[in-house]
Design a protein with these regions (language model features):
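Surface-exposed patches in mature extracellular/periplasmic domains of secreted proteins
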Residues: 36-40, 75-80, 91-94, 138-141, ...
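Soluble non-cytosolic domains of exported or imported proteins
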Residues: 19-20, 53-58, 70-74, 118, ...
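A cross-kingdom marker for long, charged
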Residues: 180-243
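Sec-dependent N-terminal signal peptides
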Residues: 3-13
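Solvent-exposed, polar/charged alpha-helical surfaces in well-ordered, non-transmembrane soluble domains
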Residues: 23, 61, 65, 77, ...
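Surface-exposed, polar helix/loop patches in the mature regions of secreted/periplasmic/lumenal proteins
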Residues: 78-132, 203, 214-220
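N-terminal Sec/ER secretory leader and immediately downstream segment
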Residues: 17-103
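Extended amphipathic alpha-helical interaction segments
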Residues: 100, 104-191
Length: 243
């Protein structure tokens, strides 16, 4: 009986999430909001490419499929339960609110004149570490710039693991922007609420989901890069054949 239970438990942990679970999760967590930014990157990289109307749909499909294949059904149920708690729902709402550059500048200027308590700043820093991982930012940046780094591929063998100056600048820029958004979004939360939020974000399943979402973004980027690097050659061949 014990063996059967363990086998059953193991199977349930490996069982992939369903499309419906992924849809529910993205609806409540707003995790796919980051696809808007990646589409903007694609638009800028597609300057000399013919834009296809189904690109946005393909991006969403690839992203959702990756989550579906790398998160188990049990993990999705756990994530849904966490995101349905009042503190996580409030977190999503507050962080989803947009803010103009002018308002953010005014907010940061006010912070200089009226500094936050050390306790609040420490909690924000801890939440930042939980939600923004340097290695994930760096991996995405490298994926985003791979098309332009092929020319220097021959020197890759001599490169060290240490990020380049440009890569480190990108990481710091993302971290600074994310921290400012946290400071602004969480200003309405009490210290106790922030501690509760930090505790929720420390959950192992949220940490895994964040990692998988980051990998999904990179997967989408890689799929896109492969597409736009192959299309120009096809167009050239087509042009030559018509001459």
């Amino acid at each position: 009986m014990k063996k059967l239970f363990l086998i059953s438990l193991f199977s349930s942990l490996l069982f992939s999430a369903s499309s419906e679970q992924i849809e529910q999760y993205l609806s409540i967590s707003k995790a796919d909001a980051q696809l808007v930014s990646i589409e903007q990157v694609f638009d800028s990289m597609r300057q000399n490419q013919e834009r296809e109307d189904n690109n946005s749909q393909e991006i969403n499909q690839i992203y959702r499929k990756y989550l579906e294949e790398h998160l188990s059904s049990n993990e999705l149920e756990e994530l849904l339960a966490l995101y349905r708690t009042p503190i996580m729902q409030r977190y999503v709402v507050e962080m989803e609110s947009s803010i103009s550059k002018e308002d953010m500048s005014a907010f940061l200027k006010d912070l200089e004149e009226n500094p936050l308590t050390t306790e609040r700043l420490d909690i924000v820093d801890n939440i930042l570490k939980l939600t923004v991982k340097e290695d994930e930012i760096l991996a995405f940046y490298k994926s985003m710039t791979q098309r332009y780094r092929k020319a220097s591929k021959k020197s890759d063998n001599n490169q060290t693991i240490k990020p380049t100056k440009q890569e480190q600048q990108y990481v710091e820029m993302v971290k600074e922007g994310s921290k400012n958004e946290l400071l602004y979004g969480l200003q309405v939360l009490s210290i106790e609420e922030m501690k509760e939020l930090k505790s929720a974000l420390e959950s192992a399943v949220i940490s895994k989901a964040s990692k998988i979402e980051s990998e999904a973004m990179i997967h989408v980027m890689n799929q896109f890069i492969q597409g736009i690097t192959s299309k120009p050659q096809a167009k050239v061949q087509e042009t030559n054949s018509t001459l």
